[in-house]
Amino acid sequence: MQLTELSIKNQNVFVQHYIDGKEEMSSFFDYSIHHKDMWRERLEDLSSRFFAREELAAYLTSYHNKFGSSAMQSAIEKLKDPSSAAVVGGQQAGLLTGPLYTIHKIISIIVLAKQQEKELQVPVIPIFWVAGEDHDLDEINFVHTSEENGPVKKKLPQSYWKKSSAASTSLDQEKCAAWIDDVFAAFEETDHTNTLLDNVKRCLRESVTFTDFFELLIADLFQEEGLVLLNSGDPGIKKLETAMFQKILRENDELARAVSDQQAFMRQAGYKPIIESGKEQANLFYEYEDERFLIEKDNGRFVIKELDLGWTRDELHTHMEEHPERFSNNVVTRPLMQEFLIPTLAFIAGPGEINYWGELKQAFAVMGFKMPPVMPRLNITILERHIEKKLAERNISLQDAIERGTENQRETYFERQIPEEFTAVMDQAKSQIEAIHKTVRQEALKVDQSLEPLLLKNAAFIQDQLQFLERTVMKRIEEKEGYVLKDYERIQNSIKPLLAPQERIWNIMYYLNRYGPKFFTTFKNLPFSFQNQHQVVKL
């Protein structure tokens, strides 16, 4: 296995300017990731803040008992050290761990935590924030598999409440087991298949919810690294979040204004905000009968219109004290809650997160916080040996394949195989036959004007026959050149499936099935670096 790097620009202008260290980024973030003293500055800032370390460690210790991992428990123990900090990143609880970028994000968290622990000489804990309170299950209930004509979305055929969270939605064991079999049936059977499949199904049997299943698989892959999981949808964490829920309530109007002002500033600077937020939103959700509902503001009251529920500010404050488990964060308040709970040395962010965190600088300030350093996660492409070979055979650069895919090269190659004379003769035939037929039509219409529809239909039929002949010849060329054309498709399906980055479509199970556990051990321990280069892992 070999690690190389490529320089690939991000298509999001704001993200690329952040990566490039443009001066105007200081208006959106509190720390510059390009500043050499940034880590010590952040550590010093954290030292002046209070964190409920003992309480958080006690909760996490209890929560992690189910994983039976001494490395995880040792990492949690480090949180009690007042000098310790954490590298944090998060993602939704996707089935079979979700797209590859979830794995890449976790590797980013672990790599940066190890690097900074060595550099700063303080304990640095890798923490993965599992978005268990997220209720958009349609974003996590599928994986893509590679079929004859490219990637196919395989969706778990299970119904659930529309607004129920991942942490409270039970998996249908029978349907999920059958779905897993269906996913693995799309893989080529190898020496690793049965062991991997048995392990995945064991994790399923030990799970109740989407979040359980996700966490067990992640723990199985990363527990040796001491990765700590924080499930935001677990009722147990809510007691520690109560004071922050109440602070969000107290500062609610100011918080909404801060987000709105920052977004306006972002637009003025020529960038595009992505958070959909309004001043009538309270930026908190309320759980009612296993479904999540957005709390809104209406004439000084906090309401849930769908349920005809409402509270005064004081009533809601008391309700938070009595039932914190009923409340959860939205896209605005989740980063703030993370900052309240965890001494965060750095936040590992995907491109979309970099954009929306840039919309929250003033929101952090309203809460009395500085936004933690936002580190772009590692962008990784896995290059299989047979694909690398085909790139060389077809004279395609890896950079081109990653940035643009191979559809255009395939089309260009195919067009070159069509004899120029054939194309010219076909165009000439269509034109000449139409000219002759037009003369015939004109003469026929002199006999009977009512023949016009029939004559036009006849002309179209003749042209259709010519096009049929043309398509038949094209099909023969495609069959003749099938092996080469298929190479272009194989490259695209591996590196730029559906014209998206590999890490957004494919799932780690394909690689674990094909290359086995040793592949993953080597993969996660590669010497990745945070130089904002695209990482290429050659197998």
From Swiss-Prot:
Q: What EC number(s) does its UniProt record assign?
A: 6.-.-.-
Coiled-coil spans in chain: 455-475
- Which Pfam families does the record cross-reference, listed alphabetically? CC_BshC, Rossmann-like_BshC
User: What is annotated about its quaternary structure and interactions?
Assistant: Homodimer in solution.
From the Swiss-Prot or TrEMBL record, give the protein name: Putative cysteine ligase BshC
What HAMAP family does this protein's entry cite?
Answer: BshC
Coiled coil recorded as keyword: yes
What keywords tag this UniProt record? Coiled coil, Ligase
Q: Supply the source organism's classification.
A: Bacteria, Bacillati, Bacillota, Bacilli, Bacillales
Q: Show the GO MF annotations.
A: ligase activity
Report if keyword Coiled coil is assigned: yes
Residues the entry annotates as binding ADP: S146, E384, R385, H386, R490, I491, Q492, N493, W506, Y510
Q: Which family does it belong to?
A: Belongs to the BshC family.
The record, for InterPro entries, names: Bacillithiol_biosynth_BshC, CC_BshC, Rossmann-like_BshC
What job does the chain carry out? Involved in bacillithiol (BSH) biosynthesis. May catalyze the last step of the pathway, the addition of cysteine to glucosamine malate (GlcN-Mal) to generate BSH.
Q: What happens when the gene is disrupted?
A: Mutant accumulates GlcN-Mal and does not produce BSH.
